[in-house]
Amino acid sequence: MCSNEKARDWHRADVIAGLKKRKLSLSALSRQFGYAPTTLANALERHWPKGEQIIANALETKPEVIWPSRYQAGE
């Protein structure tokens, strides 16, 4: 990737599809961690480090890979 190209965040459908491939869902993950079923969906729309980490762990990656715009250096 060139330095002037911006990394793109995963589309929310890609995050959900990745979870489905692992036989998971956002609501199941939310309940597993003691949240209301819709709570982790907030991480798809806005920066919430704890929720992003839960989702990233389930997808076996890092939050900055899924949401690079939220973790850009110097911001």
Swiss-Prot record:
Residue ranges of DNA binding: 26-45
Keywords: DNA-binding, Early protein, Host cytoplasm, Pyruvate, Repressor, Transcription, Transcription regulation
GO molecular function, one term: DNA binding
Signal peptide limits: none
Compartments reported by the entry: Host cytoplasm
Annotated function: Switches off the PcM promoter thereby blocking expression of the major repressor Repc (latency factor) and favoring transcription from the early promoter (Pe) and hence viral transposition and lytic development. Negatively regulates the early promoter (Pe) thereby controlling its own expression and keeping the level of early genes expression independent of the viral genome copy number.
Protein name per its UniProtKB record: Negative regulator of transcription
Organism of derivation: Escherichia phage Mu (Bacteriophage Mu)
